[in-house]
Every structure is written in structure tokens, then in C-alpha cells.
Amino acid sequence: MNVAWPAPRTLVVAGLGLALVAAIAVGGWYWYDTEQRRVGAAYAEVMTRAYAAQAPQATSDTRTRVARELEELIARHPSGASAAEAAYELGNLRYAAQQYPAARGAYEIAVARGASPTVRTLARSSIGYTWEAERNFAKALDAFQAVAKDLGPKDFLYEQTLLDLARAQELAGRTADAVATYQRLLKDFPAARRADEIRGRLVTLGAPAPVPAPPTAPASAPVRR
């Protein structure tokens, strides 16, 4: 049986085509890697200025300029690996400037794009702070309640979130709920860093604070005869 082999030119053209595709793939990967490094470096540079801008000695002009840089960087590179962290820091700068709606918008970006649970939790709590600063206690309460539902006693920010929730409940006039939250906090954290403050709030609200359990005595060593 006669087999028709491809002409040598066809084989050469096909080989060149495969080589070209491979070269494009390698070049594309190299370009992507280079671009990601460039974007990462840009974020790192601006974020360094953002941290410095939040120092007490930083001027309002500095904070405004850095906030604008963060805003522009996020708009140019919204899918950058550090976009969520940058949005969170932008929110902090806007919050410090008492621009609460703008801060809330930045925090919402951090929540939407954050791969880190810590960044998302911080941003979600900060949304509650913006509502509280605007004296919209009902929305602040909703925000803190949503965060508290997703956290357990072993989670980062659990203690602070319950304190925020109880404070919002007080401000919203829901005294019984605030008492329950404070008591829950003391139950989960008998040795909480702010236990005295929490007990003080319970006394102010006319509720008894849970009595801390006495420390358990260490087991005595067996007597050898």
C-alpha cells in the first residue's frame, strides 16, 4: 500500500508553526510574570506611603495625596494581588478624613476582592464603623451582627467584634441585646483584656456581671510511701 507522506515543505511549515506557538506561549507567560511583578512593586511602593500617611505626624495634604494615589492604582490594576489591602488602607485614609461614604465604598471593594479572611473581616467591621460615625446605628448594628455571625471564639477579632456589636446595640436602644452580648463575651472570655470595662457596662445597664470562676487548684502529686 502506498502511503502519501506530507511534502518536506509542509513538515517544515508545520514545525515552524509549532515553534512559533510555543514561543508565543513562553513570551506571554514572561510578559504576564513581568507585568505582575511591576504591578506588585507599584502597590508595595504606594502602600508604604499609605502606612506612613496614617502616622499622627502626617499632614492632611499628605493623606489626601496618598489616598488619590491608592484610588488611581486600584482603578488601573483592579485585579492586582494587593488590591484588597490597598482598598482597605484607602478606606482608612478616607475614614480619618471623615469622608465616611467614600471610606465605606473602599471597604466594600476590600470585602469583594479580598482573598484574606483577615482583610475581609477588618473591612466588614470598618463598614460598621462608618455607619456608627454617621450615627446610623441601625445599619452599624446590622454590619457588626453580620460579622459576629461568621466568627467563633477562636477567630481573630471575635472579642473586638462582640464589643462593637454590644456598643451598637446600646446606641440603637436595644439594651437587653447589649446585656446578652456583654454576658456572652465574659462567658467566652472570662479573662478578656477589657473584662473590667465590660463589667462596668453591665453595671451601668443594670445587669449583673457573671462572677468569674475561681482558678482550678493544680492536682497534688501522689504521696509516695
Regions found by a protein language model. Give the residues of each.
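Short solvent-exposed coil/turn linkers within tandem alpha-helical repeat scaffolds
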Residues: I74-A83, A97, V111-R120, A148-L157, ...
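N-terminal positive-inside, membrane-proximal cytosolic segments immediately preceding the first
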Residues: M1-A19
